[in-house]
Amino acid sequence: DSGMEKGLEKQTPVHFGSGDSASTNNLIVVDENNTYQTVDGFGASITEASAHLYQTNLNDSAKAAAMQALFDKESGIGLSMLRQTIGASDHCVAPYNFAPDEQDDSLPNWDFSHELIEIMPTVQDALAVEPGRITVMASCWSPPGWMKENGSVLGMYQNQKGTLRADKYQAYANYITKFIQEYASRGIDIYAVTPNNEPDHASYDWPALPMSHTEAQNLVANYLRPTFDRN
C-alpha cells in the first residue's frame, strides 16, 4: 500500500507547543543563529503522462479543482515550482523528442509541436493559478537517440550504454537551449536547468543519459554555458 490515493487528502492538523525535555521523540530544536541552505520551493512535474490524463479525463471544473488543490496557497498545498522534462521521461505516453532525425548541430528540423498538444496547455493552467509565484526548471532525461552512442533514447539498448557521443555535445547544448527559448517565447522563463536526470542510472526501460561527473563538467563548462551566453 503506497498511500498514493491519499496524496491530496487533508490530514489532522499538527499542533506545535513548547518543548518537553522528558519527551524527545517529537522534539524539534531550531537554532535561529545558524542559517543553512535556502529552500527555493517545493513542487512537481507536469509530465506527458500527467498532462494526458489531465487533458483527456477531466472536465473543466475538475481541471480547475485539481490546479487549485496543487498550486493555490490557501485552498491547496501551494506548490511553487515545476520541474519540466525536456522531451520524454519515464512518465510519458510514448518516447518522443524534438529533433527525431539526425541533422546538423544547429537542429534546423527542430519540431516542438508535441509539447504544445497537452503539456504546454497544462503548464499554462498551473501558472495561471497564481501568476508570477510559480517558478519553472527544466531537466532532460535523454537527448534524441542519434546524439547517443547506443542510438536510442533509452539508457541501455542492446547491452550498450546510451552515453552522449563525443561529437554531439554542441548539438545537445543547442537542444536544451532551444527548449528554453520555446518556453520563453510563450512567456515562461526557465529558472534553472539540469543537463540530465539520474546520471548514474542507465535504464533499459526508459529514457536516460548516463554521464560521469567529468562528462557533465565538460558539457556545462565548454558547451552549455557558452551556448546560453550566446543566446
Where are these regions (language model features)?
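Acidic, contiguous N-terminal accessory segments
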Residues: 3-4
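N-terminal catalytic cores of secreted or lumenal carbohydrate-active enzymes
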Residues: 8-190, 211-214, 222
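Core alpha/beta catalytic barrel or barrel-like domain that forms the active/cofactor pocket
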Residues: 139-140, 192-198, 231
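Active-site clefts of carbohydrate-active enzymes
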Residues: 147-150, 200-205
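Gly/Pro-rich turn-and-neighbor structural signature
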Residues: 202-231
